[in-house]
């Protein structure tokens, strides 16, 4: 059985792990990339990586995100040097993000970089970014537009949301792999993820 799951965030990632236990490599997760951000010299893809960590059994289940038993030594040392310290990345998380940055800087696609990461972590399912073109979710609050991660982490997600926009969505296209996953699926599932910032960018 082939299942295509649209997901982003912890809820969708947990469902993906449960589905993989049932359908194995018949599962394809189409993950939101509107949260993606470049920081500390690396390319961070939070939702695809969160899904990957749940699927590989490496996630910190207490927090619901990140890698269990992983430290922040590299991040903390970089912060001592004056690097931005608002977006924390653990050691193994940094490794994935550094690999992705280097892979894409050499001309590789985001889709292929994620495939290498999932394969390296022994994931049976397929994890596809929603597009290889950059899409960035931006939030308007207190009269200013800012990236989603800045809003959630720096602002704490506490100020009233006045607007949401997806920068780059008009240029973004689905990949051949994504189209194949949808067209060949016996079942298409929209995961229990935030409908505006996780599912919305995928459907847009």
Where do the protein language model's features map onto the residues?
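An anion/phosphate-binding loop that grips the pyrophosphate of nucleotide cofactors and donors
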Residues: 185
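Extreme N-terminal starter segment of soluble prokaryotic enzymes
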Residues: 1-4
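Short gly/ser/thr-rich secondary-structure transition/capping motifs
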Residues: 167-173
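A short, Lys/Arg-enriched amphipathic alpha-helix followed by its capping loop at the start of a domain
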Residues: 14-27
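Short glycine-rich anion-binding loops that position phosphate/pyrophosphate groups of nucleotides
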Residues: 10-11, 30, 193-197
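Charged helix-capping and loop-helix junction motifs
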Residues: 202-204
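Electropositive, gly/pro-rich neighborhoods at or near active sites that engage anionic ligands
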Residues: 21, 32-166
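Short N-terminal binding/cap micro-motifs at the start of the first secondary-structure element
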Residues: 11-16, 37-40
């Amino acid at each position: 059985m082939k299942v295509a799951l649209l997901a982003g965030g912890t809820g969708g990632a947990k469902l993906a792990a449960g589905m993989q236990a049932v359908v194995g490599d018949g599962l394809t997760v189409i993950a939101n990339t509107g949260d993606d951000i470049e920081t500390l010299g690396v390319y961070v893809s939070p939702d695809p990586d969160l899904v990957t960590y749940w699927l590989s059994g490496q996630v910190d289940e207490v927090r619901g995100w990140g890698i269990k038993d992983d430290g922040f030594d590299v991040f903390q040392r970089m912060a001592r040097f004056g690097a931005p310290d608002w977006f924390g990345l653990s050691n193994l998380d940094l490794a994935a993000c550094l690999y992705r940055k280097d892979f894409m800087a050499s001309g590789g696609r985001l889709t292929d970089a994620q495939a290498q990461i999932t394969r390296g972590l022994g994931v049976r399912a397929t994890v596809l970014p929603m597009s290889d073109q950059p899409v960035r979710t931006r939030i308007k609050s207190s009269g200013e537009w800012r990236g989603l991660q800045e809003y959630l982490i720096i602002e704490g997600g506490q100020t009233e949301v006045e607007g949401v926009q997806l920068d780059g969505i008009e240029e973004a296209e689905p990949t051949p792999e994504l189209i194949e996953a949808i067209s060949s699926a016996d079942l298409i599932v929209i995961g229990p993820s935030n409908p505006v910032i996780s599912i919305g960018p995928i459907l847009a």
